[in-house]
Amino acid sequence: PQRRSLQNMIEGWRVARASGDIGRVMSFYSPQFSSGKQDFTRWRQSVERDVSQLRGKAIELKDLAILGWQDKGDILVVTFGEVAEGQRTGAVKRQYWGKEGGLWKIFYEGVIG
């Protein structure tokens, strides 16, 4: 996939997260999502808490890195620092994206720093 279209897709996730629209945010996640500790339903509850704490603040993604490879299908590993407006630092996150029905979906997300 083209790097620009991947950046646009990740930007769409960022905008959805900053908007506070849980339905929009969760549309980026696979129903098979797992954080290792949480399934899709529990993850949604975590996202709802996170988004309510942001209260519509802008989010910046710093040091965005996208690595793609093929295993059983196309996989993207996306790493970035998520910094909310008014903050100097934030969590470093890693997401794994896979294709489902031709669409990229997040099937794993975790904080790595």
Residue ranges and their predicted role:
Residues P1, G90-G113:
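Short beta-strand edge/turn micro-motifs at domain boundaries
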Residues P1-I22, S27:
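Short, low-complexity N-terminal intrinsically disordered segments enriched in polar/charged residues
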Residues R24, G36-K37, Q87:
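Short, solvent-exposed loop/turn elements at domain surfaces
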